[in-house]
C-alpha cells in the first residue's frame, strides 16, 4: 500500500516538471550506507542514488512514513542528501538556510558547525524549521523603520521614525513604548503572542565606559518596554551584525550609510570589535538628499517636498567609477514621480553620490568614505586578532543610500588604490544583499533558525532575574 502511494507520488511529482539535477548544489554529503542485514526487498537491486532520487520525488511526509516501514528504508529516508533537497525546494534560499544552520545555530558566541561532523541532521532541521513560531521583526533606525512577520518574504510595513517618534536612540521609556505600540497596532497583533526580534540601532560607537553604559541603557530600556507589554521573548542584535548575516558572513567590515552619519564597523565572529576602532563620518543619507536638493534649486528644478528629492535620489542617482570622465558624458535621464509629474536630471545624478568620496564638493571637512574604510582596515591589520587577515577584507554595504548603483565598484577601486597591496589583495565590497531591507533579512535568518527562539532570545523571567543580579 505504501509503495503504491510512493509511486503515485513519484508520478505526480515527475509530471510537475521539476529539474532534480538543478537542485543538487555543490555540497559534500556523506554517502548512505546500508548494513548487510538491512533489506529494501525488491528495491535491493537499485543503486542508492536511484533510491534517493525516487524519494526526492515524494512529499516529505511520505518519505517519513516510508522510513517507518523498516530500518533499511529509514536509513535512506533520513539521509542528509534527501532533506537538503527538500530544504532547497523551500521558499528560503538554500545558501541562506545552510549558512544560518551551520554558522548561527549555536547562538552567541558563534560556533561553526560542520555539515560533515555528524552534529547536523537536516531531517531534524527540516522538521524543526516547520515548527518554529512566527516572530515579529522590527528593524528601527534614526531615519526609517521596517517591520513584519518572519515568515514573510519582506517587511509588511515601514515608517519614518524621525518624523513619527523622534530620536528612538534616546532611551526614553514613553517614546519607545509609543514606537512599539504603534507597530503592534499597525500589524494588528497582540505583543504577548509571539517572540520579537529587534535590531539595536548603531549609536554610542566608542569603546569607552561612557559609551558602553549608554548602549547598555538603551538595550535595557528596549527590554523593559517590551517585557512590560508582555512580549514572551526578545532577541536583540546589533543592526550592523544583522546586515553581515544577511550577506552570509560572520566576519567582515560593515559600512552603514545611516540617516545622519556613516559608520564603519569591524566585526569578528558576530562581535563588533570596538577596541579595534569604529570609524564615524559626520554625515549620512540626509546630507546626500540635501545636496541633491541644492543642485536642483540651482538648476531651477521645482519640487514639492524633500520626499520628492529622496525619490529622485533613489531612482536616478548613481556613483561614477571615474568622476572626471563622467563629467564629459551625456548623463541626462528622466523619471515620473507620482503626483508631481516628470523630472529630468543630468550631472546631479552622479554628483550627489560623489560627496561620499569628495565631501568638499558639498562644503564639508570630513573624511571620505574610502579613507574611513582604509583606516578601519589598517587598524584591523595592526590588531592581529587572527592568524588570517582575510576576515576584514570583505566589506558589506548597508543603508538606503548604500544601494546607489556603482557604489560598491567605486569603493572597491578606491580601496585598491589607497591601501598597500599587503592589505588590498583580496578585498571585496558587497552591495546591500537585500537593498534597504538588508538588516531586516539578517534578523529573518535568525528568527527562522531551527532552534529559535532557543539561545538567541531572552525571556521576561530571565531578564528580570539578570536585572536583580545587576542591582
UniProtKB/Swiss-Prot annotation:
It comes from Arabidopsis thaliana (Mouse-ear cress). GO terms for biological process: actin filament-based process. It holds the Pfam family Actin. CDD domains: ASKHA_NBD_AtArp8-like (cd13396), F-box_AtARP8-like (cd22156). The keyword Nucleus applies. One of its GO terms (cellular component) is nucleus. ATP binds at residues 256-259. It is found in: Nucleus, Nucleolus; Cytoplasm. This is Actin-related protein 8. Ubiquitously expressed in all organs and cell types. Higher expression in seedlings. PANTHER family: ACTIN. Belongs to the actin family. Plant ARP8 subfamily. Its main location: nucleus. Residues 40-86 form the F-box domain. It comes from the Eukaryota. GO terms for molecular function: ATP binding; structural constituent of cytoskeleton. Keywords: ATP-binding, Cytoplasm, Nucleotide-binding, Nucleus.
Amino acid at each position: 500500500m505504501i509503495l503504491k502511494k510512493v509511486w503515485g507520488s513519484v508520478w505526480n511529482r515527475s509530471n510537475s516538471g521539476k529539474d532534480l539535477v538543478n537542485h543538487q548544489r555543490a555540497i559534500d554529503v556523506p554517502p548512505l550506507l546500508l548494513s548487510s542485514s538491512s533489506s529494501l526487498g525488491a528495491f535491493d537491486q537499485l543503486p542508492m542514488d536511484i533510491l534517493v532520487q525516487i524519494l526526492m520525488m515524494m512529499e516529505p511526509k511520505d518519505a517519513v512514513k516510508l522510513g517507518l516501514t523498516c530500518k533499511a528504508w529509514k536509513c535512506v529516508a533520513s539521509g542528509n542528501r534527501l532533506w537538503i533537497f527538500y530544504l532547497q525546494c523551500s521558499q528560503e534560499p538554500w545558501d541562506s538556510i545552510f549558512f544560518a544552520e551551520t554558522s548561527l545555530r549555536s547562538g552567541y558566541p558563534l560556533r561553526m558547525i560542520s555539515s560533515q561532523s555528524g552534529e547536523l541532521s537536516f531531517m531534524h532541521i527540516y522538521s524543526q524549521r516547520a515548527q518554529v513560531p512566527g516572530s515579529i521583526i522590527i528593524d528601527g533606525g534614526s531615519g526609517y523603520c521596517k517591520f513584519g512577520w518572519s515568515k514573510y518574504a519582506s517587511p509588511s510595513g515601514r515608517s519614518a521614525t524621525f518624523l513619527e517618534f523622534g530620536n528612538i536612540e534616546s532611551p526614553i521609556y514613553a517614546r519607545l513604548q509609543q514606537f512599539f505600540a504603534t507597530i503592534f497596532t499597525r500589524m494588528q497583533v497582540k505583543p504577548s503572542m509571539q517572540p520579537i526580534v529587534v535590531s539595536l540601532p548603531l549609536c554610542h560607537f566608542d569603546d569607552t565606559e561612557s559609551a558602553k553604559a549608554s548602549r547598555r541603557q538603551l538595550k535595557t530600556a528596549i527590554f523593559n518596554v517590551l517585557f512590560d507589554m508582555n512580549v514572551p521573548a526578545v532577541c536583540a542584535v546589533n543592526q550592523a551584525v544583522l546586515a553581515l548575516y544577511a550577506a552570509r558572513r560572520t566576519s567582515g567590515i560593515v559600512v552603514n550609510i545611516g540617516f545622519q552619519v556613516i559608520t564603519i564597523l569591524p566585526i569578528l565572529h558576530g562581535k563588533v570589535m570596538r577596541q579595534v576602532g569604529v570609524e564615524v563620518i559626520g554625515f549620512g543619507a540626509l546630507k546626500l538628499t540635501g545636496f541633491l536638493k541644492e543642485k536642483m534649486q540651482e538648476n531651477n528644478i521645482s519640487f514639492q517636498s524633500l520626499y520628492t528629492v529622496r525619490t529622485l535620489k533613489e531612482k536616478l542617482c548613481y556613483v561614477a567609477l571615474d568622476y572626471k570622465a563622467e563629467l564629459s558624458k551625456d548623463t541626462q535621464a528622466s523619471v515620473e514621480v507620482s503626483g508631481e509629474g516628470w523630472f529630468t536630471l543630468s550631472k546631479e545624478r552622479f554628483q550627489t553620490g560623489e560627496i561620499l568620496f569628495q565631501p568638499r564638493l558639498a562644503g564639508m571637512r570630513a573624511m571620505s568614505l574610502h579613507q574611513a574604510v582604509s583606516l578601519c582596515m589598517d587598524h584591523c591589520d595592526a590588531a592581529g586578532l587572527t592568524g588570517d587577515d582575510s576576515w576584514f577584507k570583505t566589506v558589506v554595504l548597508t543603508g538606503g543610500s548604500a544601494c546607489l548603483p556603482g557604489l560598491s565598484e567605486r569603493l572597491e577601486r578606491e580601496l585598491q588604490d589607497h591601501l598597500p597591496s599587503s592589505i588590498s589583495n583580496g578585498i571585496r565590497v558587497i552591495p546591500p544583499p537585500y537593498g534597504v531591507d538588508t538588516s531586516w533579512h539578517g534578523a529573518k535568518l535568525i528568527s527562522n533558525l531551527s532552534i529559535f527562539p532557543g539561545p538567541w532570545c531572552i525571556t521576561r523571567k530571565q531578564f528580570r532575574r539578570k536585572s536583580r543580579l545587576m542591582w
